[in-house]
């Protein structure tokens, strides 16, 4: 007679062996082989099984144009389940780096229980063998018994998406994105955009700018965030364009950071020179999320977007010099093996303001430039760049903001002298701030303000000399132009006289 103790002993030994072999299999067998074996197993098992599998891809379209929001929400939901149940986890720093956030690692599975029903989530990665596309495609698979199909596809999935959204809002960390180079396809394994936490401290309160202009900017941004229904009513995509222009050091980048902090938006820093062509630019724009600011800094330098309708320059020699410089830069790029971007002006306009721009809402687009007159009018027209904001040199109102930020003072005996100088002298807020910043523990407000006064006086004298030199150069150019015109008129007169003599001689001959 078979004894119960022997049965239990046999069963326990068998289960222990199976658990051991399963652990070895998961730990040491490469995931490529595991994927293949598991696919074969599921196919065989599917003939006699009632299991259902639902696949959630990272990108919604076959060609990966737009990232799936459902995929991100499910990843958020699974992050809380993975910590306690998964064997392999991926650790990332959380907001403010105070703790770690654990999430499901690639090629790992985790169980979940909902209303007594057990389901299994697995994260897989598929890599194309096509050399032209070496990117990795991620997808999540939900597996469950067929008898629970209705409950899982309605109640459970609604629960997952709702919980994932709440977790995402709770753990949301604003990010600064930059586009990966089209030439570096391996970077695309993490998507078209790479990101780091956005932690810039700039605010409108600390921005060195005219108070009235700042308040107008804040009101404009608030109006935009509340304008979803209004934009739909008037038939426009929910986006707004800002053009920030002014000399270097006047706070254009700081303004963008202040806007992002004010709205609590992510920032996408789009580097056009690394974008392969117009098609790639569209994909990048589609892969940006709502509640974000897309920035193209120094757009006059990013690509040759200024020459299509460029105004004729005053001096031909300056134009020739610039053409020589451009040719030298192109030659240098070819020698380095760098590929030139094929993004065109029309391609950029279509990406930011064409049919494709309506694919995601609540988005702000910002261009910055040091030279407004260099830009093509089509690029900055009203309706495309709705708000043109001049970031000018530091005047007294902006100086008072900087003095409060750097020295924590709102009045001083030198303020009167400084007011006179900043109104007469063109100095950028960045240069003013550098003079106000204490260089040692001994530097107090008196020392810093005295240093600023001296710097302003030197800058004023320098500007005066430059103006005199420019005046002399202009006089020399005018003299050359008058001389050249006189020589041309003289040549023309001589030619007319020569033609007259020839005609006279021909008449005598006849």
From Swiss-Prot:
The keyword Flavoprotein is assigned to this record: no
Cofactor(s) annotated in UniProt: Mg(2+)
Pfam assignment, any one: AAA
A GO BP annotation: response to stress
Transmembrane segments: 7-25
Keyword Nucleotide-binding: yes
Top-level division of the source organism's lineage: Eukaryota
Annotated catalysed reactions: ATP + H2O = ADP + phosphate + H(+)
InterPro entries from the UniProt entry: AAA+_ATPase (IPR003593), AAA_N_dom (IPR025753), ATPase_AAA_core (IPR003959), Mitochondrial_chaperone_BCS1 (IPR050747), P-loop_NTPase (IPR027417)
Coiled coil (UniProt feature): none
Positions annotated to bind ATP: 246-253
Annotated keywords: ATP-binding, Hydrolase, Magnesium, Membrane, Nucleotide-binding, Transmembrane, Transmembrane helix
UniProt GO cellular component terms: membrane
Topology in the lipid bilayer: Single-pass membrane protein
GO molecular function ontology, one term from the record: ATP hydrolysis activity
Subcellular location(s) per record: Membrane
Region (Disordered), start-end ranges: 460-510
Family of this protein: Belongs to the AAA ATPase family. BCS1 subfamily.
PANTHER family listed in its UniProt record: BCS1 AAA-TYPE ATPASE
Protein name per UniProt: AAA-ATPase At3g28540
Organism: Arabidopsis thaliana (Mouse-ear cress)
């Amino acid at each position: 007679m078979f004894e119960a103790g022997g049965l239990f002993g046999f069963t326990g030994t068998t289960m222990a062996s199976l658990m051991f072999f399963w652990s070895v299999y998961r730990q040491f067998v490469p995931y490529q082989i595991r994927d293949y074996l598991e696919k074969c197993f599921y196919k065989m098992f599917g003939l006699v099984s009632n299991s259902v599998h639902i696949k959630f891809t990272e990108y919604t379209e076959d060609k990966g144009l737009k990232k799936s929001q459902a995929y991100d929400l499910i990843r958020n939901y699974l992050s809380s389940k993975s910590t306690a149940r998964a064997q392999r986890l991926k650790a990332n720093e959380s907001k403010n780096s105070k703790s770690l956030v654990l999430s499901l690692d690639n090629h790992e599975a985790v169980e979940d229980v909902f209303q007594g029903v057990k389901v299994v989530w697995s994260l897989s990665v598929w890599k194309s063998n096509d050399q032209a596309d070496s990117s990795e495609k991620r997808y999540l698979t939900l597996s469950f018994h067929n008898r629970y199909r209705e409950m899982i596809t309605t109640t459970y999935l609604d629960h997952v998406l709702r919980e994932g959204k709440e977790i995402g809002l709770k753990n949301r960390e604003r990010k600064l994105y930059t586009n990966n180079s089209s030439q570096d396809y391996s970077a695309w394994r993490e998507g078209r955009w790479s990101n780091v936490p956005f932690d810039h401290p700039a605010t409108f309160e600390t921005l060195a700018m005219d108070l009235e202009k700042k308040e107008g900017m804040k009101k404009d941004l608030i109006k935009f965030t509340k304008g979803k229904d209004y934009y739909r009513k008037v038939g426009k995509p929910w986006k707004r364009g800002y053009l920030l222009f002014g000399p270097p050091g006047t706070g254009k980048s700081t303004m963008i950071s202040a806007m992002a902090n004010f709205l609590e938006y992510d920032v996408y820093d789009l580097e056009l020179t690394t974008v392969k062509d117009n098609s790639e630019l569209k994909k990048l724009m589609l892969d940006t999320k709502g509640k974000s600011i897309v920035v193209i800094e120094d757009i006059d330098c990013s690509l040759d977007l200024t020459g299509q309708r460029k105004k004729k320059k005053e001096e031909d020699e300056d134009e020739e010099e610039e053409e020589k410089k451009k040719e030298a830069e192109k030659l240098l790029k070819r020698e380095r093996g760098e590929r030139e971007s094929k993004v065109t002006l029309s391609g950029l306009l279509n990406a930011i303001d064409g049919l494709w721009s309506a694919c995601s809402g609540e988005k702000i687009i910002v261009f910055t430039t040091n030279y407004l007159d260099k830009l093509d009018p089509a690029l900055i027209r009203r309706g495309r760049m709705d708000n043109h904001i001049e970031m000018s040199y530091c005047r007294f109102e902006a100086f008072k903001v900087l003095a409060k930020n750097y020295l924590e003072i709102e009045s001083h005996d030198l303020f009167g002298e400084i007011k006179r100088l900043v109104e007469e002298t063109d100095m950028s807020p960045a240069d003013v701030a550098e003079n106000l910043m204490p260089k040692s523990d001994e530097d107090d407000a008196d020392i810093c303000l005295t240093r600023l006064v001296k710097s302003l006086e030197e800058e004023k004298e320098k500007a005066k000399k430059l103006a005199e030199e420019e005046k002399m150069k202009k006089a020399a150019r005018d003299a050359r132009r008058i001389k050249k015109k006189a020589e041309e008129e003289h040549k023309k007169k001589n030619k007319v006289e020569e033609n007259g003599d020839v005609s006279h001689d021909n008449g005598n001959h006849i």
